[in-house]
Amino acid sequence: MNSADTQEPKSFNHTDMWTAFGTTMSGALETDPRAVVVLADIGAHLFKAAAIADPNRVINVGIREQLMMGVAGGLAMCGMRPVVHTVAAFLVERPLEQIKLNFAQQDVGAVLVSWGASYDLSEFAFSHFTPGDITVIDSMPNWTVHVPGHPQEAADLLLESLPGDGRVYLRLSSQVNRYPHAVRGTSFTPIKYGTRGVVLAVGPCLDAVLSATSMLDVTILYAATIRPFDATGLCAAVQAVNRPNVVLVEPYLAGTSAHQVSSSLVSHPHRLLSLGVRREMEDRHYGTPDDHDHIHGLDARSLSNSINSFLG
């Protein structure tokens, strides 16, 4: 098995994505005249200094998520670049109608930045769980979806998302990989090469996947951007292995990107195993994110069992 070239670890002061977002976005407010932050109370502490420096560039509407989307939509129609932030459940699910009407219907863009999906905020239990956020975003056309696995990637992808007028969803997590990898547009990053199949690891799942497959002769692809889906990269990886086995490991609902895999490989007979947050259960326990990873089979040991069984 040959290892692919990966990015050398960068010197980065932030150990979590939330802090990286606040620092990076505060810096962007100083240099980008179009950028404006819209909040629903959560995350306001990240922008105290920025709000004092320019109150018109940090707008906190209080716990009114529908209003937050309306304000952001209006700003976008005026030529600004709104960055909208709160907990994932309150960013994507609660104001879904306003997202559709204020952005998709008006054909304007924004950067929606979430925190806490799928079950990072386990201390608040089921009301704050959002394993279906990517599925919700997928129901609307023309969204770019970033799922970083490291604070440095989160910062890089945020800065990449600010220019232009596209619709972007940036999913921040408390779970992180040990090292960042280079953000290469929408292309998947090869981590290592093998012959028995291809494992696509999304965002913070990578370290567990690497541990689970350390003794397996498989190709590992890493995705920090999952929409648009890198069909070309996946096809090339599958064509290069001896067995067309594909394992998809996502930190949200299992099978969320299965249709993308099938469409990408429509001309290539293949087998697919989709791993992620289980759809057949609603786990309402508190616990920790690691506990929930184990329940849903996303810890390294469970992944190893599932992948080994699939490969045979």
Swiss-Prot record:
Cleaved signal peptide residues: 1-28
Domain of life: Bacteria
Induction: During the interaction with host plants.
Functional description taken from the UniProt entry: The FAS-operon encodes genes involved in cytokinin production and in host plant fasciation (leafy gall).
Keyword Signal tagged: yes
Species, as recorded: Rhodococcoides fascians
UniProt KW Signal keyword: yes
Keywords: Plasmid, Signal
Pfam families xref list: Transket_pyr
Protein name: Uncharacterized 33.6 kDa protein in fasciation locus
Gene Ontology MF terms in the entry: magnesium ion binding
